[in-house]
Every structure is written in structure tokens, then in C-alpha cells.
Amino acid sequence: MSRGLFASLYEAGRPFALIDTRERRDHVDGHWFGSTNIPLSVLTAGITRMVPDRDFPVHLLDWRDPASNAAAQRLSQLGYASVAHCPTSHPGGFGEGFVKGEYVWSKAFGEVLAHRCGLPEVTPSEYLQHHRDALLFDVRPTAEYRQFTIPGSQSLPNSLLLANMEALKASGRTALLHCAGRTRSIIGACTLKAAGYDGPFAIFKGGTQAWQLDGHDREHQAGRVFAGDTDNPAATRAFLDKWRIPFDRVEAGDIGPFVEAHRGRLLFDVSDDAARGRPMEHGILKLSGTNLIQQTDQAVARYHVPVVLFDHGSGSRAAFAAYWLRAMGFSVQVALLGGRLDEAPAPDAGQIETPFPVLAADELAAHWKHERPVLDFRSSAAFRAASLTGSSWLNVSACLSGSPPPEPAVIIANDIPHGVGTADLLAAHGWQVAGIFPWSSATQLEPAGIVPGDPGIAIDESALFAGRHYGNMQDSRDYLAWEEELPGQIDEPILAQWHRLLAS
């Protein structure tokens, strides 16, 4: 068992990563707080992105199953030289560091924050009866706002609050901040409080889920965007000075030397709130500043490693994220850029060596016509969107618990590196691999042969509270209750640290 492992590693104060390589569904159903989920099915891409230094101390949770053994072997093949194997198991209940759900680090932190700040909350019925003159603001990224929101709400992501405080105040009306549940609205309201905003504001309690639970319909495809940015960083610099967050001004020609001077740190470009983890030049990862705070344990695998946040324009996105990362216990600084970063060049697939044949479209068709197994190892979401007629969806972790098929199989993968990694895992388990077809070459296939797929029960997707945004009211009730209970289930030393930092 691993009770207390994360807390002991964290309290030691030395850099470390605690990795759980089970598939997403199993991890969400129960995991050790502080562990980062990098599933075996995407381990190669995930670990090299989140822990690029092959000498970095990695603590691998060993669930004593074939998939855990395969993960250990894969890390060794990738050159990770400092891997500690940590035997573990499900303790049979939740609490004392064993939790369920996703983004638990951020959600538990948000609940601690809510209890400390004591900010006003407005329920849906109170809004309709007494606060219809207030302005509703959805503080999620705009793309999520467009999917669904509360009728009449405007898009104002958390990471742009600092850049829009004057516009908020100029409205002369109460700002009601909401998200889909609780965490991001709590963070947003507390951001305004920390910034010294003196206009009226409150939290719309329970967000869109509470709105639905009260029997109201959501609005879809809304387009009212309140958020704006400015090229003037003066106001943001005032917040950085007030909060004592170190920052540098970095011009376009100086980015390379700046990154080299900060090599080994966590480098995030938070300048685009729609970003979802795009690799940028110099090894910088581009992601949403709003979601970096709401999904911290999906972005950060290396603890006790300083964070550098890159931003341009007003810099409000970096200032927002820096303030809350520091409150969570991270060492953080900001780099205000004179221009935008370029995306990293795509890897040259032609240089990848593989012992497995890489099939062209006609070769794949020949295998299919002879009724040989054609197995798709992409994500279930990708398979559901488009698949080869007659192919079957599989997940590599599930495959390792069973017997290999009697005849050679064709593997469909995202690309050649993904295919090679998957084929290596299967071959080590006794599979015969006839070849790899990278779905990046799917444009060569006959369009009539590509159809939506049915992956069945997909272990790479979470089933916990899965219906909360699709009309399942019980899932919504359970989800909101789960969020509020989280602080009592995480490791006590982390909880104590958050209280200490928030009190300072």
C-alpha cells in the first residue's frame, strides 16, 4: 500500500514525480492523491513531455499486474535511470490520501479556499428572485462556455479577470461568477478579492449543474465574449509587484538564452486560454492558464521544480496562474514576452526506426480483405469519431491481461511513434504484429471505408459522474457533494501547507 507516500516525498523537499500508469477509468475510480496519471497507452508521449529529463527521480506505482510491469519495462527502454518501484493496492475505502475523481489537487484546493474566504454565494433561485440585475460571467475558457452556459452569461475566463477589472467595475453591476460546478468560480472570485477589486461580486453557487438541478435549461453556442486583453502590461505588473511574484521582460531574440538559463524548470506558455498542451519552441508547453489552475495535477508531474510562466500582451494570464500556483506551494516566476512563441516543429517520422512494417493504405486493405485482425489502439474518442470498417478498438493495458490472438494483427495507431510503442508492448507479451498503420495516413484510405466506431466500454475514459453535463441529475448532485468533501480525504500535510500559505 502507498498511504503517506506522496506526503513523505513532498515533505522531503526534493524533486520527484509519482506516476500512476493505469488507464484513466481505473485511476479516476480510485488513486493516491498527488499521483500523476500517465496511462500506459500513452506513456511514451506523456512521460517524455511531462518528465523530459531521463535522470529525474520517478516513483512508479506498481499495482502488481502485467500493465505495471510493462510500464516499468517501457520506462527502462526510454532511458529513465532513476525509477523507484512502489508496490501499491486499493485500500478498500476512500480517505487518508486515497481519493476518486479527476483534478483532485485543484478541486481540493478550491474547497479549502472557499472555506477560508467566505465569499458570498447566490443560488439559482436567489438569482431569479433577487439578483436578475446582476451580470453573469462564465469563467471557464470560452470554448467550454460555447458548449453550454447559463442563459445570458458572458464569457470571461479566470485568466483574463485581471485585464478586465476596470471594465467590470465600469458596468456598475454585481458580477456573478460561475463555471460548470464550483472550483473555477471560487478561484475567480478569490482572484478579484486578492487583486483588491472593490466592485460588488459573488459566486453563482453550483454553476450550470445547480442551474439544471433547479429545473432550468442551459444555453448552447452562446457568443457573448466580455473578455478582452491589452498590449499594456502596466496593470499586471502592479499585481505582480503587489504579490511579490518575480518577473522578467523577455524580447523575441532573447527567448532562447532565457530558456537555457532556466533549463530543467516547468515551462508553460499560458498566453492562449484555448490551448490544450501544444508543444512550442524551446521545450515550452502551451496550455490554458485558467485550466492550469483547475487541472494542475494533469499539467504538473514534477514536484519541487520551479515554474516559469510565459505570456504576452497584458500578461494577466500569467499573473493569475502564478498567484495561485504559489498559493498551492509551487515556486513560480513570470516571463513577459515581447511577441508570440512559435510552435515546435513536427517530429520527422521518416527518421524513426522500427522493426515492424509500416503499412501503406493498399497493404492495410489487403490485410482487411483476408479477414486478418485489424486492431485500433488510438483513443476511444478518436475511434468513435472515425474508424476503419471492420476494425476493432482495443486498449493496450487491457490486452496485457489476456492471451494474444493466434494470428498476426495489424495495429492502427495515431502515428508511427505511437504504433511502435504499442507494438513493442504487445510483442513483449507474445503478440505477432503484422504491421503498423498510422492514422495520420488515413487520407489515403477510401472515404467509404471510414465510419464512426463503437469502442464499447472504454477504459481510457472516466465513467465517474459522466452524465453530469448530459442531463443526469444524480451525477450532478453526487459531483457537487464530492467536491465539497475532498479536503477531508487528502493528505493532512498538504492540507496544512495550503492553510499556512493562504494565511500568509
Regions found by a protein language model. Give the residues of each.
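Rhodanese-like catalytic fold shared by cysteine-dependent sulfurtransferases
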Residues: 1-17, 21-135, 139-266, 270-373, ...
